[in-house]
């Protein structure tokens, strides 16, 4: 029996899960197994929809541009893309023509039919596709090809190879898709390879969902951290320094400093010990850690130094990660089970050679500072440490205003190459799954998404406009304890290998800065705002009164000042609204007499005749409690 028979009468089912494998409905169900349905509007269903849409995109391009050669075309978080080698770059007009052709293919109801073939057969069928041949030559003996079959004639209209699964036919795609933009990329991300055109699109289960997504995209343009960073004078990325290397200006520096100081305090409260490591090291360390083997393409080239002490000199590298250094700290002295868990933290700056096309503002940079930590634990304390790390993550992100999450669990692909025994992987995966489920958060599986050295869980956080960002990772490592010969002495006096956990709660301060800038649309909560209080005198006669009041804030380390400019008051207010100052105070004659001020908020609401002590207490409470204050109602809630 296949999936079509098993789910007959279920028009909403587009694929199935059996033995933790995603399968086409056309595949046979193993004897004694009961498959789970995958509906179109489920997370897996949307992934399959988008993957099928990528195939239709490629078919449309090749039907219009006969010279187009195929690269790869996966689904993405909200859509899909496909890479093409073409003689001329695609334009916006090209995308409209391609999209029209896609709709024609969708309405023709072509079936997606899977067939497993050997490498020789695949080589023959894709003999005119050089990029596909490169992939075929690097694959195992067999691979699956999906054929688009004409509904009337039964002839093959197009084909591509991939794991699948796919929708039963193109008709299931519907009309809720759109091509969004095109960019230039290098084949396999390597600048030594040919340049290709990457066409992006999005696809959804309904027209309403598509419109909602496109509306969010337009909103995202308004809150783009690159745009706001320039408007608010937060940071820049000067060409003189190089791609992906950021300068934080005074205001941006204040925000980042507040972010770092609070995160450091919370880490200390959670029992982490801060260490520091250099930015460069000899080649030997990264050979020992395996980074040169597994991560070398993402590292900056070496610097040959120390020829005065050695005729050949030594290769030094900018560090891409902090973990090898922390393992040296662990191994610097004998360790007992009494010292574990050992939590080593570092706000360490690392350098990664991202391709120029992948760099994106502060969200993807070449120089980044990670809120990095490595936990060395016994097997007995491993589960508790992972649970604590996850709880700490959720709590800390909540303090910065992110409070909606789901957890992704990345496990290994059974066919891949991995370090560690099957028993170790099964144990670690079980613990991560248990901790994730015990958290009460929604969980999603990411089969095959684990790194070669261990499974991981990642926290995906939802921002104010509905986008999810991968924020925090908690990653098990079977690799470094083995490579660095790490051990501790247990109760019986025997040497045991510690379990090592990598975790970064923000990913990097640069990326988290970008996320918060867009989440708050530049209107940071008062505790993070570079300028927290600005006081405006109606006339110069009111300056001494405001100076006296504003001076009180300095004892609380609150950033407050009096504006001495001679501009008209309405103009000043408009200027500070544009700068997104959380608290704008105004004082005139009546305020001097009554010892009050007027306080204006970002949305234009205000409170007049507010006693200065009450104003002071409210501002201090807003900052101390890390509350977002946009309106009078927000401020009133703090005063209650």
UniProtKB/Swiss-Prot annotation:
Entries under InterPro entries matching the protein: aa-tRNA-synt_IIb (IPR002314), aa-tRNA-synth_II (IPR006195), aa-tRNA-synth_II/BPL/LPL (IPR045864), Anticodon-bd (IPR004154), Anticodon-bd_dom_sf (IPR036621), Thr-tRNA-ligase_IIa (IPR002320), Thr/Ala-tRNA-synth_IIc_edit (IPR018163), ThrRS_anticodon (IPR047246)
Location in or out of the cell: Cytoplasm
Co-factor remark: Binds 1 zinc ion per subunit.
SMART domains: tRNA_SAD (SM00863)
Substrates-to-products reaction catalysed: tRNA(Thr) + L-threonine + ATP = L-threonyl-tRNA(Thr) + AMP + diphosphate + H(+)
Cofactor(s) listed in the protein's UniProt record: Zn(2+)
The protein's Enzyme Commission number: 6.1.1.3
Keyword Phosphoprotein: no
Protein name: Threonine--tRNA ligase
Species lineage: Bacteria, Bacillati, Actinomycetota, Actinomycetes, Micrococcales
């Amino acid at each position: 029996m296949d999936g079509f028979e098993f789910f007959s009468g279920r028009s909403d089912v587009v694929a199935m899960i059996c033995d933790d494998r995603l399968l086409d409905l056309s595949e046979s169900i193993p004897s004694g197994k009961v498959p789970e349905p995958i509906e179109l509007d489920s997370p897996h269903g949307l992934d399959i929809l988008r993957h099928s849409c990528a195939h239709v995109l490629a078919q449309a391009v090749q039907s219009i541009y006969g010279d187009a050669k195929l690269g790869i075309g996966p689904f993405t978080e909200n859509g899909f893309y496909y890479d093409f080698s073409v003689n001329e770059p695609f334009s916006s007009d090209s995308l409209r023509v391609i999209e029209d052709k896609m709709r024609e293919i969708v309405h023709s109801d072509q079936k997606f039919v899977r067939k497993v073939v050997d490498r020789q057969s695949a080589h023959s069928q894709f003999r005119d596709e050089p990029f596909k041949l490169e992939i075929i030559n690097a694959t195992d003996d067999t691979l699956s090809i999906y054929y688009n079959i004409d509904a009337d004639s039964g002839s093959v209209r197009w084909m591509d190879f991939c794991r699948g699964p796919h929708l039963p036919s193109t008709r299931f795609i519907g009309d809720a898709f759109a091509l969004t933009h095109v960019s230039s990329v290098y084949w396999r991300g390597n600048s030594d390879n040919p340049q290709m055109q990457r066409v992006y699109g999005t696809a959804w289960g309904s027209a309403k969902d598509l419109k909602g997504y496109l509306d969010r995209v337009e909103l995202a343009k308004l809150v783009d951290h690159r745009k706001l960073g320039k408007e608010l004078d937060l940071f820049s990325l000067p060409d003189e320094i190089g791609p992906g290397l950021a300068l934080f200006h005074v205001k941006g520096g204040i925000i980042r400093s507040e972010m770092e100081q609070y995160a450091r305090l919370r880490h200390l409260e959670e029992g982490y010990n801060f260490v520091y490591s250099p930015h460069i090291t000899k080649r030997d360390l990264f050979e020992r850690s395996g980074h040169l083997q597994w991560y070398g393409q993402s590292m900056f080239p070496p610097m040959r130094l120390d020829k005065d002490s050695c005729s050949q000199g030594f290769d030094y590298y900018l560090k891409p990660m902090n973990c090898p250094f922390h393992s040296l700290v662990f191994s610097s002295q004998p360790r007992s089970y009494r010292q574990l868990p050992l939590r080593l933290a570092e706000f360490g700056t690392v350098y990664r050679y991202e391709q120029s096309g992948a760099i994106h503002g502060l969200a993807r940079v070449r120089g980044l500072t990670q809120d990095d930590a490595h936990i060395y634990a016994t097997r007995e304390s491993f589960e508790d440490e992972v649970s604590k790390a996850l709880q700490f993550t959720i709590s800390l992100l909540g303090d910065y205003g992110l409070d909606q999450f789901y957890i992704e669990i990345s496990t290994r692909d059974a066919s891949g190459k991995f370090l560690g025994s099957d028993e170790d992987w099964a144990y670690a995966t079980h613990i991560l799954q248990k901790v994730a489920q015990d958290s009460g958060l929604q969980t999603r599986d990411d089969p095959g998404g684990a790194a070669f050295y261990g499974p991981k869980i990642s926290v995906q956080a939802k921002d104010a406009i509905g986008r999810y960002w991968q924020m925090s990772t908690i990653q098990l490592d079977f690799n470094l304890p083995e490579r660095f010969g790490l051990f501790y002495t247990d109760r019986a006096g025997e040497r045991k290998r510690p379990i090592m956990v990598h975790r970064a709660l923000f990913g990097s301060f640069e990326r988290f800065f970008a996320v918060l800038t867009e989440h708050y649309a530049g209107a940071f909560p008062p505790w993070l705002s570079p300028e927290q209080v600005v006081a405006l005198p109606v006339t110069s006669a009111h300056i001494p009164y405001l100076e006296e009041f504003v001076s009180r804030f300095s004892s609380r380390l609150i950033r407050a000042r009096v504006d001495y400019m001679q501009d008209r008051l309405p103009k000043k207010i408009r200027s500070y609204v544009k700068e997104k100052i959380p608290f704008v105070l105004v004082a005139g004659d009546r305020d001097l007499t009554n010892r009050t001020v007027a306080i204006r908020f970002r949305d234009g609401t205000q409170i007049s005749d507010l006693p200065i002590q009450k104003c002071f207490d409210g501002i201090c409470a807003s900052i101390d409690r890390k509350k977002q204050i946009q309106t009078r109602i927000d401020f009133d809630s703090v005063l209650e």
